[in-house]
Each structure stands twice: as C-alpha cells, then as structure tokens.
UniProtKB/Swiss-Prot annotation:
Cofactor(s) this protein requires: heme b
GO biological process: mitochondrial electron transport, ubiquinol to cytochrome c
Protein name: Cytochrome b
Positions annotated to bind heme b b562: 73, 172
Key words, A-Z: Electron transport, Heme, Iron, Membrane, Metal-binding, Mitochondrion, Mitochondrion inner membrane, Respiratory chain, Transmembrane, Transmembrane helix, Transport, Ubiquinone
Organism classification: Eukaryota, Metazoa, Ecdysozoa, Arthropoda, Chelicerata
Family the UniProt entry places it in: Belongs to the cytochrome b family.
Cofactor binding annotation: Binds 2 heme b groups non-covalently.
Function recorded in the entry: Component of the ubiquinol-cytochrome c reductase complex (complex III or cytochrome b-c1 complex) that is part of the mitochondrial respiratory chain. The b-c1 complex mediates electron transfer from ubiquinol to cytochrome c. Contributes to the generation of a proton gradient across the mitochondrial membrane that is then used for ATP synthesis.
Transmembrane helix as UniProt keyword: yes
Residues spanning the membrane: 23-43, 67-88, 103-123, 168-188, 216-236, 278-298, 310-330, 337-357
C-alpha cells in the first residue's frame, strides 16, 4: 500500500502554484460524490414513464435521507460544471494547452460530462426533461442522409417515449465510469511531465514534495467548498433547477420557453443564433471543440502569457462572452436577445482566432 502512496506523497510539485490549481482535486471529489449518490438514487429509481416522476417524489418524501441524496446529486452537477469551467479558464490563462495530450484528454472529459449531465436531466421526466430531450435529440436529425434514422434509433420509436427513458437511464448509469476512466488517463498524462505553474517557467530547480504542503492546501479548498455546497443543498436545494420540471411531462402541452440546464445555456445560445439547423448543430459542437485549437495555434516561443496584456484583454473578453451567452440562452428568442446572441457568438469564436495573434 505504501508503494502506491509514496509516489503521490513525494511527487515533485512547483512551489509557486496557487489555489487555482486546486480545482483538479475538487473535481475528483465531485466525481466520486456524484457516482456514490447516483448509485443510491438508482436503487430507488424506476425507468418507466408512468412511474419515473412519482419515484422522484417517493425518493424525496419516503426514502431515508432521500431528499439529501437527491439534492447533493442534482446540485453536485452544477458545482461540477462551475469547477470544470474555472479549470478550463485557468488552463487557458496559464497556458496549459502546451501539454497537448493533457488538453485533448480534458476536452474528451468535458464531452463525456456534458453527455452524462444531459441524460441525467431527462430522468425525472418533468416537463422540461421531456421537451429538452425532444428538442436536443431532434438536432441529430440535421445530419445529412442518416439523421432521422439515427434519431429514431436513439428514441427507440418515432418520438421520445418509454424506450427513450430506459436507454437514457442505462447510459446515464454507464457514462460516469467511462468518465472516471478518462479522468485516470488525464491525471496520468499530467503527472508524466509534471504540472504547469503561474510563471510558465521550468520549475525543475524549485520543486517541493506534494505532502504535506499541497495536501493541506487541497484539503482546505475541499472544506471551504464543502461549506458553500452544504449551504446550497440545505438552504436553497432547488436554486439551480427549472420550475417547469416540477410538473409531470405532458407531450400535449409545450412550455412557453424550452431550455436545458444553466451549464449548457452558452452552447444553446450559440445554437439558436444560427438560423440554419445544421449550421446551428455544427456551431454547438464547435463551441467546445474550438478550445482544442489552442494546442495548434499558440506560439510555443512563449511558455506563459501571464505578463501579456493583450492576451489578458482577449481572455477576459472571452470570459465575458461566456457569461453573456449563458444569460442570453435563458432568454426568449425575441429582440434584442436574438441580435445580442448573434453578436456575442461572433465575438466568442473570433476570440479563438485573436488570442493566438497576441
């Protein structure tokens, strides 16, 4: 056992890494929490459209501490995405994209996480779950020639129905373990060459053991976030949820405004800003894939852009675009929100071409 622990305990770590490097460990804690709470929820859930909604009510009311487990699982997804977006932003700000294999594995993790979260959003079988599933899976029909066939295959019929829920529950149970496998690969690749640092310089002459210095730092970060998370799940457990999802799914009544969970809203706003269906789907996928471009477009002569003022300006414009798109994704498609979505989408993609020129 000590042979397994010692390499981690004595891991040479740059002495100047800040609390922005804590999010890796926080994401690991989030993933384990989601898997454990998900297993307990799966024991009491029924993947049938006639009972799924009532089973959520049963878990909340009748299962011992069921309300707490569900609240941790539902809000844990939001905390997970907050951390992963900060983690990606930190990676861009401190030039972690020069570690190409690590960066590519990280993007794969984001896609796996988004797929897992989307499938989980469908399971309660509320109004927004049903219509969200209908709208988002319908996007697959935009694929030329095979689109409709693939959509019907995913649905298990000609509409979102019982077969769809069973399939989504199965995949939602399976994907976290694939995600865990990708995370292990990601961590292995990071520790193969060592971590980056704020200055972007070689720290081979100034490294210290991971334990006790960084174990204490990581534990402090975990306890601080645990306090904030505890407040969220106990005082305001439904703060991140959509009010429409407290109504049982009804295919005969369309909600006035269909939207996914808040962490997908930036991509959803990009999708809606393109008037063509296929173009919108391509823009949606590219909103994540384009982050990979930094691996190939950034100038390797500068190992850090921390002291580059123009880079910082472009970076914060990109961050503001992300927040603006998240806000616009929750708004109805009408003036001025539709126009603002188009402008912000153009600026968002433009930043990925402008930043390498800094």
């Amino acid at each position: 056992m000590l042979k397994l622990i010692n390499p981690l305990k004595n891991l040479p770590t740059p002495s100047n890494i800040s609390y922005m490097w804590n999010f890796g460990s926080l994401l690991g804690v989030c993933l384990l929490t989601q898997i454990i709470t998900g297993l307990f929820l799966a024991m009491n859930f029924s993947s049938d459209i006639s009972t799924a909604f009532s089973m959520i009510s049963h878990i909340q009311r009748d299962v011992n501490n069921g309300w707490l487990i569900r609240s941790i699982h539902a809000n844990g997804a939001s905390i997970f995405f907050i951390f992963i977006y900060i983690h990606v932003a930190r990676g861009i700000y401190y030039s972690s994209f020069f570690f190409k294999n690590v960066w590519i594995s990280g993007i794969l993790i984001i896609f796996a996480l988004m797929a897992t979260a989307f499938l989980g959003y469908i399971l309660p079988w509320g109004q927004m779950s049903f219509w969200g599933a209908t709208v988002i899976t319908n996007l697959i029909s935009a694929i030329p020639y095979i689109g409709m066939s693939v959509t019907y295959w995913i649905w298990g019929g000609f509409s979102v129905d019982n077969n769809t829920l069973i399939r989504f529950f199965t995949l939602h149970f399976l994907l976290p373990f694939i995600l865990l496998f990708l995370v292990v690969i990601h961590i292995t690749l990071i520790h193969e060459k060592g971590s980056s640092n704020p200055l972007g310089v070689s720290m081979n002459l100034d490294k210290i053991p991971f334990h006790p210095y960084f174990t204490i730092k990581d534990l402090l970060g975990i306890f601080v976030i645990l306090m904030i998370f505890s407040y969220s799940i106990i005082i305001n457990p439904y703060g991140f949820m959509d009010a429409e999802n407290f109504n049982i799914a009804n295919p005969m009544i369309t909600p006035p405004h269909i939207q996914p969970e808040w962490y997908f809203l930036f991509a959803y706003a990009i999708l809606r800003s393109i008037p063509n269906k296929l173009g919108g789907v391509i823009a949606l996928v590219m909103s994540i894939i384009i982050i990979l471009s930094f691996c190939f477009t950034m100038n390797n002569k500068m190992s850090s852009f921390y002291f580059n003022i123009s880079f910082k300006l472009m970076f914060w414009i990109l961050v503001n675009c992300f927040f603006m798109l998240t806000y616009l994704g929750a708004m109805p498609i009408e003036y001025p929100f539709d126009l603002m979505s188009k402008i912000t989408t153009i600026i968002y993609f433009l930043m990925f071409f402008m930043i390498p020129l800094c």
